[in-house]
UniProtKB/Swiss-Prot annotation:
Source organism (scientific name): Xenopus laevis
SMART domains documented for this protein: WD40
SUPFAM superfamilies named among the record's database cross-references: WD40 repeat-like (SSF50978)
Family per record: Belongs to the dynein intermediate chain family.
Protein name as catalogued: Dynein axonemal intermediate chain 2
Region (Disordered): 519-542, 562-587
Length: 587
């Protein structure tokens, strides 16, 4: 900003006017050099010199305009029909064809064109141009390629108060959209003015969500209907179930009644393969599995309490954190619990207690993910604590394969839909690991630092090419894997089957060996001890009391030992002092 100040004065106060004129140069002083002064010159050594050695930097600011992107589509239908004929109506098209075939002009035109096309038709009938002559010598694709992944897009929570991206779901038709559920799962730490909205994103437009879903409570899980891509089902933090129809906007079409809903957050909701395509079931940490029909959400159609004692006691039920359902096995489903136990269930059992078939125990913490192998449904993948494990339905005591224990907690995992030996895991340090058991089993084939924030979930596209990861701050990262990680290799399915069968057989042998050792120990033990082994008399309270008793006894013994050492040490010091005094007196 320029500042101007005007000075005003009378002309008479300026003084006399200056008169300037040209004249030649004049020399006023000429000082000649003194040679005697040169003898007094002393060179300074060392000499301190200050210099500034740095890059020249300047600040630049650019205000760029943001491009608004829109999606446009064209609905192309079968052409060549009159306006009054609907190509979708079979009867109208058949009637029109018969009418045209009776026309004399049509017959002459077809006869003329037939002579031209006859030669080509005979060639097609004689030669199969699609025959593969070198089927067996087909080169393997992607084997020599180094595993890699590139970030395609990043979708950020548009709200000021960031929330965790708790669940991801791909659009079933074309996989061009991604539904993301946002919530805060930390108990009683949700911000006061936190937004409840979740979003549907177009993977090519990261600036603005395509549709905003407005539930009554934050969504913990969200799933597309595989039969109707316009319908989504969501599980809320307050235990309610709601469904949306994208053609009707972002408000839920209907929600369950709170009295008949879950009492805890709904961590998983899955669509069932039914004729109507309207049935689903949900799991929550309140220990209940509820079946629903979205045509009538007033109350659940079925209920299962996850009480492994089969007494249907809700107080003893195991909290469900993850759940799995394979459409090829319509009567079976599996549940991962907070206690690190896997519960295998049969939906078509006659009574609720019979629905719990068996349990698998192998994790030290909650099982955040459970998924069957898409190629071998008998094998399933689980993630809990610091490791990922691969199980077989035939081995209940232990898993057949597992990863090493990581330094960071694992949060989610999923199988590759195109390769039977590839699965992906996410960790709380923001790392995405891609495991390829076909080539390496000790370490991941690719470990990628996606974010500085914890990654909480992962979801792969149906073709295995793209994978999306959700973080704690609501950032969803879309990545493209290298071709070798999603291209099925030659003979890979047979090799994977042999590997799973080999590991299953090994675990069965170990289980049989352990069983024999336990029987031998029981046979050597006394009858009273044998009964004790079969039916332990001590309950959990007695075990805790005995442990506390042993602990305090050890503490008291240690204190007594230290006290005796101090007494002995003081006695030795006293004796040494007396000896030294006697020596002094003697001297």
């Amino acid at each position: 900003m320029e500042i101007v100040y005007v000075y005003t004065r009378k002309r008479s106060e300026f003084g006399r006017q200056c008169n300037f004129s040209d004249r030649p140069a004049e020399l006023h002083v000429d000082i000649l050099p003194d040679p005697s002064q040169a003898l007094n010159f002393i060179e300074r050594n060392p000499c301190d010199v200050a210099i500034q050695c740095s890059h020249d930097m300047s600040e630049h600011e650019v205000n760029t305009e943001r491009y608004d992107m829109e999606a446009h589509g064209i609905n192309h239908v079968e052409g060549g029909w009159p306006k009054d004929i609907n190509p979708q109506e079979m009867e109208q098209t058949i009637r029109f064809r018969k009418k045209v075939e009776k026309d004399d002009h049509y017959v002459t035109t077809i006869s003329q064109l037939g002579s031209v096309m006859e030669h080509c038709i005979k060639q097609n009938n004689a030669i199969n141009i699609y025959e593969e002559y070198f089927e067996e010598t087909e080169e393997l694709e992607g084997i020599d390629e180094t595993p890699s992944a590139n970030t395609v897009n990043v979708f950020r929570d548009p709200n000021e108060i960031k929330r965790t991206a708790t669940h991801l779901s791909w659009h079933p038709d074309g996989n061009r959209k991604l539904a993301v559920a946002y919530s805060c799962l930390e108990f009683q730490r949700a911000p006061k003015d936190m937004n409840f909205e979740s979003y549907i994103w177009d993977i090519e437009i990261p600036n603005k969500p395509e549709l905003t879903l407005r539930p009554a409570s934050p969504l913990v899980c969200l799933e597309y209907n595989p039969k109707d891509s316009h319908v989504l089902i969501g599980g809320c933090y307050n235990g309610q179930i709601a469904y949306w129809d994208t053609r009707k906007g972002g408000n839920p079409v209907e929600s369950t009644v709170i009295e008949y809903s879950h009492r805890d957050p709904v961590y998983k909701v899955i669509w069932l393969q039914s004729k109507t395509g309207t049935e689903c079931f949900s799991a929550s940490t309140d220990g209940q599995i509820l079946w629903w029909d979205i045509r009538k959400l007033s109350e659940p159609t079925e209920k299962l309490i996850l009480d492994i004692s089969k007494k249907e006691n809700i107080d003893n039920a195991l909290g469900a954190v993850s759940m799995e359902f394979e459409p090829t096995l319509p009567t079976k489903f599996m549940v991962g619990t907070e206690q690190g136990m896997i519960v295998s269930c049969n939906r078509k059992a006659k009574t609720p207690p019979e629905k719990i078939v068996c349990t698998y125990g192998g994790h030290h913490g909650p099982i955040y993910s459970i998924q069957r192998n898409p190629f071998f449904p008998k094998n399933f993948l689980t993630v809990g604590d610091w490791t990922a494990r691969i199980w077989s339905e035939d081995c209940r005591e232990s898993s057949i394969m597992w990863t090493k224990y990581h330094t960071s907690y694992l949060t989610d995992a999923c199988w590759s839909p195109t390769r039977p030996t590839v699965f992906l895991t996410t960790k709380i340090d923001g790392t995405l690991d891609v495991w390829d058991y076909m080539y390496k089993q000790n370490n991941p084939s690719l470990s990628l630092k996606v974010s500085d924030e914890p990654l909480y979930n992962i979801c792969m596209q149906d073709n295995g090419r793209f994978v999306a990861c959700g973080s704690k701050m609501g950032v969803t990262t879309l990545m493209e894997l290298s071709k070798g990680l999603y291209t099925l290799q030659r003979n890979e399915r047979n090799l994977a089957s042999a590997m799973f069968e080999r590991e299953t057989k090994r675990e069965k042998i170990l289980e049989a060996r352990h069983r024999e050792m336990r029987l031998k120990e029981r046979s050597k033990a006394e009858p009273g001890e044998e009964v004790k082994d079969e039916k332990p008399a001590e309950d959990m309270k007695e075990i805790i009391a005995n442990a506390e008793k042993d602990f305090f006894e050890n503490i008291e013994a240690e204190l007594k030992r230290k006290e005796q050492q101090e007494i002995k040490q003081s006695e030795d010091e006293h004796q040494e002092k007396e000896v030294s005094e006697e020596k002094i007196v003697h001297e």
